[in-house]
Amino acid sequence: MAGNSFGQLFRVTTFGESHGLALGAVVDGCPPGLEISEADLQGDLDRRKPGTSRYTTPRREPDEVKILSGVFEGKTTGTSIGLLIENTDQRSKDYSDIKDLFRPGHADYTYHQKYGQRDYRGGGRSSARETAMRVAAGAIAKKYLKQVHGIEITGFLSQLGPIKAEAFDAAQIEQNPFFFPDAGKLEALDQYMRDLKKEGNSIGAKVQVIASNVPVGLGEPVFDRLDADIAHAMMGINAVKGVEIGDGFAVVEQKGSEHRDEMTPAGFASNHAGGILGGISSGQDIVVSMALKPTSSITVPGKTITTEGEATEMITKGRHDPCVGIRAVPIAEAMLALVLMDHLLRHRAQNQGVLTHTPQLR
């Protein structure tokens, strides 16, 4: 399994399984001198961790991160940063009944066919539990981006099932368990999730993440375009089935006269492109949306097969999120931060001294 690392100059490698002893990450390429502590990482981990509300899995993991290396006297040294989170609330017995069958809609079948075996406890390596380390590593990138470049990254749930945010209040995002920016829809969300829980079912969601104050020039055409790497990062998150940059699939119904982001001496007149032109950041807000499927771990009976190919029926046991999109918000923020951090370092390496007389637009 070679796909455990992400990034080039700012590179993150993760390890660990859902019900293993621990999860870990090695972060390479962080510039020296950045003030960082476990508390800086813990904030985002607390936003992602399970058991924080009745709308997420009841598995209770403190997700307390330990910095093992790469930080001395409160500052990064420029060497590899080692991170570790211990698993403390595994209930592997919940999965003993399904070790010989495949959960439909999960990675059980494909992992088994590819590797000839699989860790059936909570999905093993394929579990979203692994994303805790991405969030921890992303918190390092987020602090550097904000402290050195003033870049702010904000994620939120823009849609849960049929309920869409029709208003945007940034102050609301961290004030409710849905990371939802529209206070007028919170009661409807609560009732919808209550009904869903009674059904024993799950639902999909849409998450949006915005990066502000991104400098113009990030992105390495043609194969490492900024939007291509962002899409790669977001599609690497569990349950993500679609990614949009800017207006995304809505451009199908737009005319060129409508879609083009006209330029004036005062700046861009619109941002249909989502802050990226020709694979390079334009200096506008980078706007990314992703669609997450409903988890197949539900108590509604479903058809499947055993490892021997025999037909059977199953009801999922264990502790699961009825909407995985809720806890995906800090994960999406982290992945966008990792991409921007990597591209900032790559841009600096090749284009540090490039100057133009053209004004930079916003």
From Swiss-Prot:
InterPro entries per record: Chorismate_synth (IPR000453), Chorismate_synth_AroC_sf (IPR035904), Chorismate_synthase_CS (IPR020541)
Enzyme nomenclature, EC number: 4.2.3.5
Cofactor note: Reduced FMN (FMNH(2)).
Positions with a binding annotation for FMN: 125-127, 238-239, 278, 293-297, 319
A GO cellular component entry from the record: cytosol
Known catalytic reactions: 5-O-(1-carboxyvinyl)-3-phosphoshikimate = chorismate + phosphate
GO function term, MF aspect, one: FMN binding
Swiss-Prot/TrEMBL cofactor(s): FMNH2
Pfam families: Chorismate_synt
Keywords: Amino-acid biosynthesis, Aromatic amino acid biosynthesis, FAD, Flavoprotein, FMN, Lyase, NADP
Known role: This reaction introduces a second double bond into the aromatic ring system.
Subunit record text: Homotetramer.
Protein's UniProt name: Chorismate synthase
